[in-house]
Amino acid sequence: MSREMKESGIDWIGSIPKSWNTIKFKYLHGGMNTGEGIDKNFWSNEPTDRLFYTAGINPIRTNYEDFPEWKYTKENDLLLARNGTPYIYIPHPNACYTDHIIRATMNASVNKRFVQYGLQCSIASVVVDSVSLATWSASLWNKQVIAWPSAEEQERIVSFLDEKCAHIDSVLEKTRNSIEEYKKLKQAVITQAVTKGIKNDCRVKSSKIEWIDKIPEKWKEIRIKNIFDFREEKNYIPLEEVNLLSLYTDLGVIQHSDLEKTVGNKAVNADGYKKVYENDIIVNIILCWMGAIGISKYDGVTSPAYDVYCPRENVDSKFYHYYFRTTGFASDCYKRGRGIMAMRWRTYSDQFRDIKVVYPPLREQKEIVQYLDEKCNQIENLVKKKKKFIEELEFYKKSLIYEYVTGKKEVPEF
């Protein structure tokens, strides 16, 4: 038999069972405080060091000794993120937390796990209504309203959801791990093809490229400057009349018009930008050691901070697109680069062009490209299906939590 329901008066909650109430978060705790900024020099990988919540998805460790004694987490605390993703943590006791975290000292009678489930739904409604909101203040958290059943029913709901969510999380973890394995497989398939070819019966010879070992006997090794020319054409056409191109480590070369939204600094004009033609290779000199290199499928312009290379005769740019995005070639870029920190590690044009690469006959380059296009497409389609499954399962998990913490569905008594 379905329960008698009533309107809660709260948009995200909707109707609740007649015997339930609603309550603001501010009435469930006895006070709030923020943590302390802890310098990265005190961050640690030692498993025996103190846990430190940083507003990331999981805590890290710290050996910092001067965290105020009264701020260490206690058994009845919840931690709430102030910035970024609005995570809600049930912390381990005696943990530290950054000043980007709010600690709420919960009332002794409160079921923290039920509150966590309810707050997750409540704060999600704020995210949907205000996607640009960057800060989750104490005032905002205190205003959150959740549905409030009896203590006994809260306990039943928590036990039910903990079991269901643990199973869902296990499936999600396995699926994410399988995606990483497919990515590794793709990288292995590419590396094998661009360094060994796709003919199993060919004779091989030693390679002078450190990470390759052996290459097919008919292949050569040649410096990049001997197969690609440095393109230095500048653009002076107004921004609104050009095809603006960007380079991403994961995605390669993308047209701005194909992006749903652009992040970071936006160009205000394209004067002095570098011209790019179809089949050119674009290189980010700062991040090429992380794979920020790619072929352009388009004519357009790109940032003057990037290098642009055009292929010479008997060079298939797509072959080198695959080759340049291997981890082996990334290590070549790193060895030739220099800088004061990893994210500012530059492989300048002269150093990049001096790197030796394999050089198969053009016919083989094209055969390898055709082979890799097919294989990579197969792997990418499998990954897309798994990502879609993850999206659906995460949506199901959120719906499941919502239905039970608002009383739309009832956990049976046993």
Indicate residue ranges for each PLM-predicted region.
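Short, solvent-exposed alpha-helical surface patches in well-structured domains
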Residues: 27, 114-117, 143, 153-156, ...
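Hydrophobic aliphatic residues
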Residues: 29-32, 119, 161, 228, ...
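Short, well-ordered beta-strand elements within core beta-sheets of diverse protein domains
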Residues: 11-15, 102-106, 142-148, 210-214, ...
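Amphipathic alpha-helical coiled-coil/heptad-repeat segments
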Residues: 1-13, 19, 148-202, 359-414
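A short beta-sheet element
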Residues: 58, 66-124, 129-132, 137-141, ...
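Non-catalytic DNA-recognition/assembly elements of restriction-modification systems
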Residues: 3-36, 52, 147, 151, ...
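DNA target-recognition patches
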Residues: 5, 26-64, 74-80, 225, ...
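Short, solvent-exposed loop/turn positions at domain surfaces
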Residues: 10, 66-67, 130, 173, ...
